[in-house]
Swiss-Prot record:
The lineage of its organism: Bacteria, Bacillati, Cyanobacteriota, Cyanophyceae, Synechococcales. Signal peptide: none annotated. The keyword Cytoplasm applies. Its main location: cytoplasm. This is Ribosome-recycling factor. Belongs to the RRF family.
Length: 182
């Protein structure tokens, strides 16, 4: 049962890492670039995807069509002041964002950011492993497990950890390749 719980928690960490990877620019338009953008709408920070439809008409353009045209200016302002580095073009109905090609320096910065996200996910996996092993050792002290059962459980947890760390490494190398591809 503990191994299933560990596996589930580790899978969630890998998924969180992948969501972080999706927010990194690769030089191509991708709607997930705006996932973390919030707009101050009626005094509350509201996620952009709750206020508008975001689409990619071509590989270098994002189109944002608000449900309420009154929020157009607020969305444009939120994009302008964000740290995304985009310049929104407002035509009165739709906001278009042209995704500029990435410079070599910017690509390297994004690779470092991807590495940081991967390292955070691996730390999360190691913390999950540590907590599980502490539970196993506690159960061994309480007499619920024999020493051999405890060792088998710990080996099982380590194998699961290695599997998910390898998955994160594979995702990272794929993301770095995507970022560096010109």
């Amino acid at each position: 049962m503990l191994t299933q719980e560990v596996e589930l928690n580790m899978q969630k960490s890998v998924e969180a890492c992948q969501r972080n990877f999706n927010t990194i620019r690769t030089g191509r338009a991708n709607t997930s670039l705006l996932d973390r953008l919030t707009v101050e709408y009626y005094g509350a920070d509201t996620p952009l995807k709750s206020l508008a439809t975001i689409s990619t008409p071509d590989s270098q353009t994002l189109a944002i069509q608000p449900f309420d045209l009154g929020s157009l200016g607020l969305i444009e302002k939120a994009i302008s002041i964000s740290d995304l580095g985009f310049t929104p073009n407002n035509d009165g109905k739709i906001i278009r964002i042209n995704i500029p090609p990435l410079t070599e320096e910017r690509r390297k910065q994004f690779c470092k950011l991807a590495s940081k996200y991967a390292e955070e996910a691996k730390i999360s996996l190691r913390n999950i492993r540590r907590d599980a092993i502490e539970k196993i050792k506690g159960s061994e002290k309480d007499g619920e497990f024999s020493e051999d059962q405890s060792r088998d459980q710990q080996d099982s947890i380590q194998k699961i950890t290695n599997k998910y760390i390898n998955e994160i490494e594979k995702n990272l190398s794929g993301k770095e390749e995507e970022i560096l591809k010109v």
